[in-house]
């Protein structure tokens, strides 16, 4: 499936990665992170050779990730997780969030991601998108 969704075509930030690597040419990998709905950071590490694909197309991410409990388990009763085959959605870098990690022995970077559903729309269960909908309702009500 094509991961360059209609929502993300204008947000591709490959140039951000290229500029970062000019300044930090010894970077060996990227920690891809997002807070779940409990505020716990969840993520993956990708080799620097996979980073361009992350910035161009996004990264497959488990749809249940934002909804994990504080122990990292899928909450009983949710339809996301093993009950529905543990489907993937896409994680796309948040503009301007790519940064070096100076405290690690190997040169690494970190980037925040936001989640996009398979339909190309912002993933409704991600806290950032929940907040965005609430703010939009307040704006619509002139509050």
Spans of model-derived segments:
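ATP/Mg2+-dependent ligation/transfer catalytic cores
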Residues: 1-143
């Amino acid at each position: 499936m094509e991961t360059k969704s209609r929502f993300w075509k204008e947000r591709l930030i490959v140039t951000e990665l290229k500029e970062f690597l000019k300044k930090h040419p010894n970077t060996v990998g990227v920690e891809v992170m997002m807070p779940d709905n409990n505020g716990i950071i969840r993520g993956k590490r990708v080799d620097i050779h996979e980073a361009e694909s992350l910035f161009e197309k996004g990264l497959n991410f488990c749809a249940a990730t934002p909804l994990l409990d504080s122990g990292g388990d899928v909450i009983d009763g949710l339809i996301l997780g093993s009950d529905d085959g543990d489907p993937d959605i896409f994680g796309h870098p948040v503009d301007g969030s790519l940064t070096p990690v100076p405290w690690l022995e190997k040169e690494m970077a970190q980037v925040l991601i936001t989640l996009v559903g398979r339909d190309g729309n912002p993933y409704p269960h991600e806290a950032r998108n929940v907040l965005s909908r609430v703010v939009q309702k307040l704006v619509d009500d002139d509050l």
